[in-house]
Every structure is written in structure tokens, then in C-alpha cells.
């Protein structure tokens, strides 16, 4: 009797009437573990039915309403419409450019200096930066250091001395002193 009362009260159209009223004559039966278990099972089944119905509805109608999407795009400003693909594509294009050539004043690849106080230092101007995809020594201002910490963005210090300056120096001792001062400056800037 108690079970039928629960069934009728739960399956009634009133959604708030989920649990049966605790009347004097059937309060003991309702509190028993058997009736509580039946009630819980019924409740779980109902929830599952609702979920299944919703899934079927989504499958039939389609999860995305095209009208809603259209309204959303119309509400956006023209500058914000579908820009991500273009940005990504431009970035890829920038990365896929060839390195700058010698005619443009840059080395075409990493070159290790083999003479003077700077022997063994790699000149990485013209190589591709792994962080930004740009050429070292081209885009950043001279004197700036790249965030990837791989290249110096100054021109090689040896390039500062033209033939005229080296002829004026004349004395070997003074020239070595100048080269040492450049080496100190170089090490303080780049290392």
C-alpha cells in the first residue's frame, strides 16, 4: 500500500510532489530502506529519460542553431569578425620567408669568427630566430638584444675598424690596447 502511494505521488503531474507526505499511518513504511530504494531508482530512471530525450532532440534539430550564430556574428564589430585565421596565416608566412642575403648587408647563416680577440664567437645576423621567426639584426634596433639569448644584434666589433682607422693607428701596441677595450665592451654587452 505504501509503495503504491509513493508511486502515485511521484508520478503525478505536480513536479514539486517528488516525495510523498509523511502521514501518521504510513510514515514508518516510507522511512524503511526498501521504499526509499524504490523511490531513488525511480528518480534516477526519470533523470535518465529526460537526458535521453534531450539527446534525441539535439540529434534531430542540431545542437547549433544557424540563426543564433548569424545574430551573434551580426552583433560583432566588423574588425572582430573571423580574424584569427588571417593572423595565424600571416605569422606562418613571416616564418617561411627566406633569410636575407649578403647584398642586404647580412650574413646568410651563422659564421664563426676565426681571427682576432673574437675567435670562436658566432655571428648570427641573418639567421632565423627560433623565438620570433625573424632575422637577427634586421628587425630589432641595433644595440637591442634578442629575447632568445642566442645572438648579438650589434654588428661584429671588428667591422668598426675601417682600413683608414687601422692605418692611422700605426703602432701595434696601441692597436692591441684598442682591441682589448673593444673585447671588454663586447663581453659586457653580450655575455
Swiss-Prot record:
Induction: Expressed during sporulation.
GO BP of this protein: ascospore formation
Keywords in alphabetical order: Meiosis, Sporulation
Domain of life: Eukaryota
GO CC annotation terms, alphabetical: mitochondrion
Function: Not essential for sporulation.
Protein name: Sporulation-specific protein
Gene source species: Saccharomyces cerevisiae (strain ATCC 204508 / S288c) (Baker's yeast)
Amino acid at each position: 500500500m505504501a509503495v503504491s502511494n509513493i508511486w502515485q505521488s511521484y508520478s503525478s503531474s505536480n513536479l514539486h510532489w517528488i516525495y510523498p507526505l509523511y502521514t501518521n499511518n504510513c510514515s514508518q513504511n516510507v522511512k524503511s530502506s526498501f521504499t526509499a530504494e524504490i523511490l531513488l531508482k525511480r528518480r534516477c530512471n526519470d533523470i535518465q529519460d529526460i537526458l535521453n530525450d534531450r539527446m534525441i532532440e539535439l540529434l534531430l534539430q542540431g545542437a547549433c542553431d544557424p540563426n543564433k550564430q548569424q545574430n551573434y556574428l551580426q552583433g560583432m564589430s566588423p574588425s572582430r569578425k573571423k580574424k584569427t585565421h588571417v593572423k595565424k596565416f600571416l605569422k606562418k608566412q613571416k616564418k617561411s620567408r627566406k633569410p636575407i642575403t649578403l647584398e642586404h648587408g647580412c650574413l646568410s647563416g651563422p659564421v664563426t669568427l676565426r681571427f682576432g680577440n673574437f675567435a670562436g664567437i658566432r655571428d648570427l645576423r641573418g639567421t632565423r630566430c627560433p623565438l620570433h621567426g625573424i632575422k637577427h639584426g634586421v628587425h630589432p634596433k641595433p644595440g637591442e638584444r634578442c629575447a632568445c639569448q642566442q645572438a648579438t644584434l650589434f654588428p661584429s666589433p671588428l667591422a668598426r675598424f675601417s682600413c683608414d682607422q687601422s692605418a692611422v693607428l700605426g703602432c701595434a701596441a696601441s692597436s692591441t690596447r684598442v682591441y682589448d677595450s673593444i673585447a671588454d665592451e663586447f663581453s659586457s654587452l653580450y655575455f
